[in-house]
Amino acid sequence: LNDYYWAGPNGGAFWNGQLIHVAEPRPHTPDDWLSTPSNTHRRYAIDFVGKTRSIGATVGSFCYTARGSAIGGLIHTFGIWDIAAGLAILAAAGGTASQLGGAPLDLPSLLDGHTFRAPVLLGAPAHLPALRACIQLRA
């Protein structure tokens, strides 16, 4: 794919040498997409005006959201090793990650090597409330 993402030590997130940012705050459109896990249809009810796409890699959700290609990402069941680099890139691009219910992501609790099993939403802070409103856990 020749896609390279990194966060610089002096700030900024980059994709193939270009500075990237999360999507600007605006109403969602049918052309927007949300990166989701492959089993989303079994775990969540999503009423999103745009598309949902499973790209097969947790770090991909972070990177596509960081560059503003995806409006956001939904992830679950991960360890710190799955998200450390992606989280740094997302934060440097102006994004954040928090639990679907709105609670902050407790990173220190992941340092013991356990797997986090709750849904986490990625995106620009301004987009997260609207995304939360359209994603529900199935019973």
What do these predicted ranges mean?
Residues 1-63, 114-139:
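Acidic beta-strand-loop-alpha-helix segment within the catalytic core
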